[in-house]
Amino acid sequence: MCYMKSFLYSMAGCILLYTPLDSLGQLNNNKKQSLLSYVDPYIGSSAHGHVFVGASVPFGAVQVGPNNINKGWDWCSGYHYSDSVVKGFSQNHLSGTGIPDLGDILIMPYTGDIRTTTGSQQDPLSGYSSYYNHADEIVSPAYYSLVKSDSVRVELTASERVAFHKYSFPSNKNA
């Protein structure tokens, strides 16, 4: 009987020792997936969503992002997914409100001659506006990037109180 108790205690000890080690191995084999893969930053940026696309953080004082030429109520956030013309990048946007406001401190990096007007949707190149393609956009929380049709790369990021702009110009063009 004594041998039987010893054997059972030994087996129970082995099981208790092996189980936590085995589960640790399983935890290490699980691939970590970023929660950002579940975020679609374009949600609400078309139709009547009025959501801006750009860089911001929760409860941040700045919402830096692109501005399209305003063609009506659907553009009140400054950006509409259906558009292909950007007129600049501003520090503040209202998102999802249904009322146009903010769009403060508009900055537009561009190449070529100095232009002081926005241009039009039909002829954006008559002013400082530029064409762009969504394939050239990178959008994620707190980061926005775009390569405009004049090959100027715009990168925007935001913290709680500060927006940071980085512009990279092609070396073969006047900027």
Question: Where are the predicted features?
Answer:
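Bacterial Sec-dependent N-terminal signal peptides
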Residues: M1-N29
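Accessory carbohydrate-recognition regions in carbohydrate-active enzymes
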Residues: Q26-A175
